[in-house]
């Protein structure tokens, strides 16, 4: 049976807030059981990368414990066996911390309020 990645319950455009944890899932199936490889912007990922990304459970999970803006990328999981290949893509967005956004808005409001008095 060719390798396949179940996609019906998988979010293809996940979002995470800065410094929060996110896990992407790659529910692969096939006979023989497929080998799963993760990619970031087309480059294969090792089991643990320099920027904290960890591949777990024989490739079934990609775990980012403290997401940063630099983690916003296209991630792909590829399930492959002798009968075929299947891929699933995830376009991960990393959103700024709500507190940081509120502070920036307050600074902008103060800046324009002071500027309009002059």
Briefly describe each language-model feature range.
Residues 1-102, 118:
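Immunoglobulin-superfamily
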């Amino acid at each position: 049976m060719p390798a396949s990645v179940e996609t019906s319950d998988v979010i293809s455009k996940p979002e995470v807030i800065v410094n929060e944890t996110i896990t992407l899932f790659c529910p692969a199936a096939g006979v023989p059981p497929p080998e799963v490889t993760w990619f970031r912007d087309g480059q294969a990922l090792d089991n643990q990368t320099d920027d904290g990304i960890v591949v777990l459970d024989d490739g079934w999970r990609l775990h980012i414990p403290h997401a940063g803006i630099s983690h916003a990328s296209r991630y792909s999981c590829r399930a492959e066996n002798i009968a075929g290949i299947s891929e699933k893509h995830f376009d991960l967005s990393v959103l700024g911390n709500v507190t940081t956004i509120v502070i920036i808005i307050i600074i902008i409001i103060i800046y324009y309020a002071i500027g309009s008095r002059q």
